[in-house]
Amino acid sequence: MQLQEIFQSYSTFGFSGSRFSSGVLPPNVLSSAAKSVPKGSRVVIGCQKGVDAFFRQCFPNAEVFSVASGKWGSGKGAYAARSIACIKAVADDSGLWISFPASECPPGLIPSNKSSQCFSGKGSGSWASLAFACGLGVSCLVYSPFGIPDSWNFSHLPDLNKWFSFYQRTSINQLSLF
């Protein structure tokens, strides 16, 4: 299965990832994800450098969740609050969360629908965001050179090297009453 096939099932996309992507995340991987977003889709992105900046360039009409707006307070906590709001925007639209962490998952971090358990100072906003998205039941795709902890219940995508998926099944196959 290719990215385009997966992305066609969604109309809202959230992108997240490392502030320092060079050397770990190949530019062609980021580009292929950007090119897979169907035209007219809603795209939500954070305000950081690195992966956020790349997708802001690709999608000039994206909704940018910016800490500088003051909407989420100030200091480090504002970045977590901003990320939580961004993830909830994707969750509310049954969208797809796409993550590009540039490090291994911090020990002890697991998916949870409680933001305080995900954003608990373990050291990686990318992984914290992914843990919260999964905890909320958001469908997720991850490009990770480091893999995903087994306890997260992600599947490796065999046709896509270093890509992993977690699908909320009802997002892909709508249940029918008739």
Language model features: what each stretch is:
Residues 2-12, 17-162:
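Acidic/glycine-enriched connector segments
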Residues 161-178:
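SAM-dependent methyltransferases
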